[in-house]
Amino acid sequence: MTNTVSTMILFGSTGDLSQRMLLPSLYGLDADGLLADDLRIVCTSRSEYDTDGFRDFAEKALDRFVASDRLNDDAKAKFLNKLFYATVDITDPTQFGKLADLCGPVEKGIAIYLSTAPSLFEGAIAGLKQAGLAGPTSRLALEKPLGQDLASSDHINDAVLKVFSEKQVYRIDHYLGKETVQNLLTLRFGNALFEPLWNSKGIDHVQISVAETVGLEGRIGYFDGSGSLRDMVQSHILQLVALVAMEPPAHMEANAVRDEKVKVFRALRPINNDTVFTHTVTGQYGAGVSGGKEVAGYIDELGQPSDTETFVAIKAHVDNWRWQGVPFYIRTGKRLPARRSEIVVQFKPVPHSIFSSSGGILQPNKLRIVLQPDETIQISMMVKEPGLDRNGAHMREVWLDLSLTDVFKDRKRRIAYERLMLDLIEGDATLFVRRDEVEAQWVWIDGIREGWKANSMKPKTYVSGTWGPSTAIALAERDGVTWYD
């Protein structure tokens, strides 16, 4: 059952995320008739606009970032009329009355989206409270990063929960809005084919890769203070681990799903001072070639020395009955050869081959779930090659390919934020992250960082356009595992 609000407040509405993702997502929902006709979207930032001026600004953002086949003049005009604007200094609580004047009755519900730096959260919450916009009918969405470690994350969450209850807080991880990520739950729990094998008896190992070809790309200040472990592993990749490893929830209600995810985070085997050398690899890209062009190294781009990692590979374990003994190899990095996010589940080989050795080597079955750039699900199978085979069957590994883009080519491809924005407006918290999840994630991440510090581990330089340091290959190879590149 939905609980739709009548007003949305969008902080940071002139920022890059708003222009590229948030405003286009809201437009897409409205163009498809998924937003109420009387929904008011109150936008705010420090930029000096009136409502008409901001509507002009928003129109330019839509023209630039919405796919041309989704743009429609009538739909655009209808959406722009939903937008209202007030210039507000988020650090001055007395200015929030301007937002209250634009919002109308709060009892009809308000969805508040803080697309701002975490350092501004407390000021925003104080202003919302003072203006009467933080009552029981409000819900609050927070963009990452939610802290730099457990202590700072707790500080943010404590400040938020002094005013809002946990059920009012919607912590965003945009990976959870991706269609293929959501499809992982359907794949696992909607098909009898996989569940009997989805455990340590049937699965040899799991690989999760999130690879980027870009370097800093304008994120110098944030990224150098964060690094790949905190930027990507703590949030996106650990959420993917949870969706692969979680037990079936009783139903698809928000807390039922999140209860099972947090059990996975708490079951992650700690990586400490004694195991960081054997279970983690860190790297930092040097100069090289990316996209056919010569590119500078990280330190040259940054303009100063830095020990921040731009690549990390980890051998992780989930210590419970289902997954005992199954390694999860995870890696992420910048300036890698391809932009790709994927999960590869490798099943155990057949216990005995009945086929002639001259027919080829049996390969273990694999399930490959590609999240980006294309949304694809593939399964590898061994088949017999056509022929008379007088000396025994000749076998080959082939991939059964389910391209969601092709299968559902008559459906619009939505960006992840469309789903998340709609769920926020309608009050469905399933794809948002609960506080205990965040805390359990940070406990594991902090242990790794403490191990790096205690052992004075520094990132190893790798050439841009390669798959990270050679030690990352060795991390898997010494277990007889090859990264799926």
From Swiss-Prot:
Keywords: Carbohydrate metabolism, Glucose metabolism, NADP, Oxidoreductase
Name of a matching Pfam family: G6PD_N
Binding site for substrate: H174, K178, E212, D231, K334
Catalyzed reactions: D-glucose 6-phosphate + NADP(+) = 6-phospho-D-glucono-1,5-lactone + NADPH + H(+)
Pathway involvement of the protein, from the record: Carbohydrate degradation; pentose phosphate pathway; D-ribulose 5-phosphate from D-glucose 6-phosphate (oxidative stage): step 1/3
Active-site positions on this chain: H236
Binding residue positions for NADP(+): R46, D89, I90, K144
GO biological process, one term: glucose metabolic process
InterPro entries recorded: G6P_DH (IPR001282), G6P_DH_AS (IPR019796), G6P_DH_C (IPR022675), G6P_DH_NAD-bd (IPR022674), NAD(P)-bd_dom_sf (IPR036291)
EC number: 1.1.1.49
Protein origin, superkingdom: Bacteria
Disulfide bonds: none
GO molecular function, one term: glucose-6-phosphate dehydrogenase activity
Presence of keyword NADP: yes
Task of the protein: Catalyzes the oxidation of glucose 6-phosphate to 6-phosphogluconolactone.
Family affiliation: Belongs to the glucose-6-phosphate dehydrogenase family.
The protein's name in its UniProt record: Glucose-6-phosphate 1-dehydrogenase
Organism: Zymomonas mobilis subsp. mobilis (strain ATCC 31821 / ZM4 / CP4)
